[in-house]
């Protein structure tokens, strides 16, 4: 390859990289999270004076599903002694 052809290829790729960076918004700056936004994510009533309010209730409690060994039937406990 001649030096002139290599130079054109380099200019082409540099031009493409500049265009891509302008279109993608590279260098616009990153928004920072401030402390006020972090305060909004707290549980209402959860303070150092009232720590019992800070406990979260699980959304879905665990329950055991169907088991192959019991053929999906629940065991009945007999009260005969």
From Swiss-Prot:
Signal sequence interval, chain numbering: 1-29
A GO biological-process term: calcium-mediated signaling
Family per record: Belongs to the plant rapid alkalinization factor (RALF) family.
Keyword Signal: yes
GO terms for MF: hormone activity
Pfam families named among the record's database cross-references: RALF
Family annotation (InterPro entries): RALF
Cystine connections: 46-54, 66-72
GO cellular component, one term: apoplast
Gene giving rise to this polypeptide: RALFL7
Protein name: Protein RALF-like 7
């Amino acid at each position: 390859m001649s030096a002139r052809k290599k130079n054109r290829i380099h200019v082409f790729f540099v031009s493409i990289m500049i265009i891509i960076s302008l279109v993608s918004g590279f260098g616009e700056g990153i928004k920072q999270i401030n402390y006020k936004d972090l305060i909004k994510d707290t549980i209402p009533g959860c303070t150092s004076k009232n720590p019992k309010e800070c406990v979260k209730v699980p959304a879905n409690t665990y329950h055991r599903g169907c088991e192959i060994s019991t053929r999906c039937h629940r065991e009945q406990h007999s009260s005969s002694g």
